[in-house]
Structures are given as structure tokens and as C-alpha cells.
From Swiss-Prot:
PANTHER family, alphabetized: OLFACTORY RECEPTOR
Residues exposed to the Extracellular side: 1-28, 81-99, 167-205, 264-268
InterPro entries cross-referenced by the UniProt entry: GPCR_Rhodpsn, GPCR_Rhodpsn_7TM, Olfact_rcpt
SUPFAM superfamilies tied to this protein: Family A G protein-coupled receptor-like (SSF81321)
Name by which UniProt lists this protein: Olfactory receptor 1165
Keywords, comma-separated and alphabetical: Cell membrane, Disulfide bond, G-protein coupled receptor, Glycoprotein, Membrane, Olfaction, Receptor, Sensory transduction, Transducer, Transmembrane, Transmembrane helix
Pfam families (UniProt xref): 7tm_4
Topological domains, Cytoplasmic: 51-61, 123-141, 229-239, 292-316
Localization (cell): Cell membrane
PROSITE patterns: G_PROTEIN_RECEP_F1_1, G_PROTEIN_RECEP_F1_2
Keyword Disulfide bond attached: yes
Taxon lineage: Eukaryota, Metazoa, Chordata, Craniata, Vertebrata
Amino acid sequence: MMLDLGNESSVTMFILSGFSEYPHLHAPLFLLFFMIYTVTLIGNLGIIVVRKVNPKLHTPMYFFLSHLSFLDICYSSVFTPKLLEILIVEDRTISFKGCMTQFFLICAFVITEMFMLAVMAYDRFVAVCNPLLYTVSMSPKLCAFLVAGTYMWGVLCSLTITYSLLQLSYCGPNIINHFGCEYSAILSLSCSDPTFSQVVCLTISIFNETCSLLIILASYVFIVVTIIKMPSKGGLQKAFSTCSSHLTAISIFHGIILLLYCVPNSKNSWLVVKVATVLFTVMIPMLNPLIYSLRNKDVKGTVSRLMHLKLQAHST
């Protein structure tokens, strides 16, 4: 849909192409993504509930993990419902305001999660390198400050990038070659010079990726040095199990981001971008609860206890 503004026309509605080139895959993809989204909600809500009901998990590490789960629910819920909708209905439209809102939210949640993972790396550094002063160093006030800072920074960065997109003119075409309002897909529809927006996005992206990775790298360099100096195998095993889940989550998260950065800008690359975005917005939120809970005895023990209590309640 176009709105006439003098001699120009402005787009008021976008059409999401999704996976329209593969109509025969729509039904199986819908079932697959619906199951993944259900597991994502159950898994991440489970982490939040488990942390609340088990006093042993009222530690900085699980405080940050519960916020990571909350972010996974949020950014998965921004993209996945719309993806499911365009797979089963013919009307694949999204309003201009709706599109920009979706982009703002996904951008804010992803940047916040990026720095939440960096904060968690710092938390692991303090836990391994200074265990005796861990509870003092990672005080509730500091934890709240770090979490609030990540949310505020994510919102600020997202507002800046979204503002740069809103300064562009969109006078047609209005078909977004994606299943959601992803930055490069929106930018490709602009009929004005996108240089300012590209510079803003590139600057913020490079700064955020570099800063978060430097915090993570510095934390784990100190952790590795501390582990090497440990005399007992028990301490080494405990330190490794503490960090392995977080390292796995970081590798998947940043690996897919770097893949998206490295995709060449060509027509053939759009399928790669779509698949990578699906992995990022649909798969990662599902995997994080599994990564953090499978090797964690406290989490598994709490889940087993809750299930046992529920079964007892049903049997009585």
C-alpha cells in the first residue's frame, strides 16, 4: 500500500516474502518452528521458575541466567509468531510502523543479550579467579547495575539504528525478501541515500561486537591462567564445568552473528541470511536452556523435585 505525498509516494505497508519460493515446505516448516518455539518458551520459563523456587540458585550466576532466559523468550517472540503466521496465511503484510517496531525490539534484545553474555563471562572470571570474595565482589547492587546497564545500552543502540532507518524514504517496492523486518532487507527497499544509516549501523555493530568479545576474551584468558595454576584436579574439573556451558552459548551466539556479517551482499546470499536468521532467532533461544541445564546438577535436581511434587499432587 502506498500513500501519496505530493509528487512522491510513501510505503505504509510491507509484504514479507518469507519462504515463498518453497511453498511445499510451508506445512512442515510451520510444524517444526511451532515445536521449537514451544520448547523455547517451556525451557526458558522453566529456568526462570527453577531459579525462583530453589534458594541454592539465588546467586549472581543464576540471576544473570534468568535474565538471559527472559531475553531469549523476548526476541524469539518478536520474530517467531510472525514467521508462523506467514507460513499458513496468504496475507503476509506488515504495517510500516509494525515493521519498524519489530526491528527496534529485535535489535534491542539481541544487543542486550550480547552484553549479558559478556557480563556472565565477567561473573565466571570473578567466581574462578577470586572465589573467596565472590559473593562480596558480585553484590546484589552490582548485579542489578550490570543488568540494568545492558538493557539501557541495548535500547539506546536500537533507538539510534531505528532512527537512522526512519530518516530514509520508502517509495516502493514494498516486498521484504525475508520473514521479518531485518536491517539489510529493510535497507534494500529505501529509495534515498542509505549511507548515513549504513555508517551508524556499522559503527554500532563493530563497537558492540568488539567490546563484548574483548570482555569475554579477557575474562577467559584470566580464567585459563588461573585453571592452569590450580594444584588439584577437583578444582580444575569444577572450574571447567562452570565455564563450559557459557563458552558453548557464546560460541553459537557470536558464531552466527559473524556468519551474518561475512555473507556477501548478493542476490544468492538472501537464502543464507534467512537461514542464519532462523538459527539466530528460533534455534538459539531453544538451545540456551538445554546448554545451561544439561550439565547442571542443581537445575536438574530442582526440575526432578518439581515434577515429583506435581505427580504426587495429581495422584492424591
